[in-house]
Amino acid sequence: MRRAVNAVKPQAIVHLGDHFDDGETVAQEFPHIRVHQVPGNCDAWRMMRYEPAVKCYDVCGVRLFMTHGHEHHVKQTLMRLLQDARAMGAKAALYGHTHLADCHREEDGLWVLNPGACGSTGGSVGLMETEKGEIISARILKNPDLEEML
């Protein structure tokens, strides 16, 4: 994740769980960048300390629905994830859990982004660009793309 932050130089970082401590470490290493995060199913201790499994915030002027995804059963279907994101007025539904990168736009304009995993499973991150409160692009950067940016 550190390499991705150095390569992309984002205005904000979203960490979608498992290994909640990694998000806290990134926040300490890059104190000038706002880090938003949710715990994953492997962060059960964090959930017991009342860290919400779902958050919906305005990040860089864009309302984002953020969850790890295990409680939305994203390995089976995205239906519940999309329904909840729409109900909260989000412009994007961000999730993890599957470790499979996914970036697409629904017919109604809702962006859906799973960054994959930037850790030991190969390396990918999601990049979302915003302007004036709108998402202008979203994509997955895989490890070779990140290497080119360094």
Q: Where is each model-derived feature located?
A:
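Core catalytic region of metal-dependent phosphoesterases/phosphodiesterases
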Residues: 1-59
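Residue-level detector of beta-strand structural context in well-folded domains
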Residues: 54-55, 101, 126
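Active-site-proximal segments of metal-dependent phosphoesterases and phosphodiesterases across multiple
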Residues: 46-88
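Active-site neighborhood of phospho(di)ester-bond hydrolases with catalytic His/Asp-centered motifs
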Residues: 12-18, 36-41, 65-68, 92-97, ...
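Short, well-ordered secondary-structure micro-motifs
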Residues: 2-4, 26-27, 47-50, 76-78, ...
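A generic structural signal for alpha->beta connector loops
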Residues: 32-34, 61, 109, 135
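Active-site environment of divalent metal-dependent phosphoester hydrolases
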Residues: 20-24, 42-47, 72-77, 93-106, ...
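Binuclear metal-dependent phosphoesterase catalytic core
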Residues: 3, 7, 86-89, 106-107, ...
